[in-house]
Amino acid sequence: MNGKVIVITGALGALGRVVAETAQQRGARVAGVDHAPSPMAVATPERIEFGGVDLSDAKQAKHAIDAAAAHFGRLDALVNIAGGFTFETVADGDITSWQRMYALNVLTALNASKAAIPHLIASSAGRIVNIGAMGALQAGAGMGPYAASKAGVHRLTEALAAEHKGKITVNAVLPSTIDTSANRASMPKADFSKWVTPLELADVILFLVSDAASAVTGALIPVAGRV
């Protein structure tokens, strides 16, 4: 990670914070992008944050990505963590949930990737890592909108990998349930010890960003924890 410049979307969320902190600990310089307001008052040579960014809007995504590249002088990797979740059946749900999941999960990754690609091609080792979902491999009851949108992320990953082979590696990690406070609150009777931790996911994500993963592209990698 030493010296690599990484943009992380969803950087203020439970997973994004851990990935950003771990990347910095390993020597990377990090630009965080999030829909939430950033608590960071002043940028540093190692870290900058862009809060209040709607990545489902292509213009806002491009502005944030270009600003990050300008701050550091280059961009080596994009980690698309921004996204959302909903649980509702097709019969009881509403079309707006499907539209919202598509915007939060597919459009955010699409817009950030499209904005980052010119910068990543200029890097000697451009990387994109997306967050898919094991739940998108086979949707269960109530998982339709979320699973369909994450399946879209899987196909986006494969398309980008094919389009930029030899220039940028593009991969996705597919977690099971992530061990976060929000998930614990919504599933209090679950066995949390079986879930994948944010740090475990960060390790896989940052491997895919690293030089050691130069031969890996177009991969959808399940990170199941102990489920």
Segment roles from a protein language model:
Residues 93, 139-147, 159, 183:
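Active-site loop-to-helix junction immediately N-terminal to the catalytic Tyr of the SDR YXXXK motif
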Residues 113, 149:
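Active-site helix of classical SDR
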Residues 133:
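Residue(s) in the substrate-gating loop at a strand-loop-helix junction
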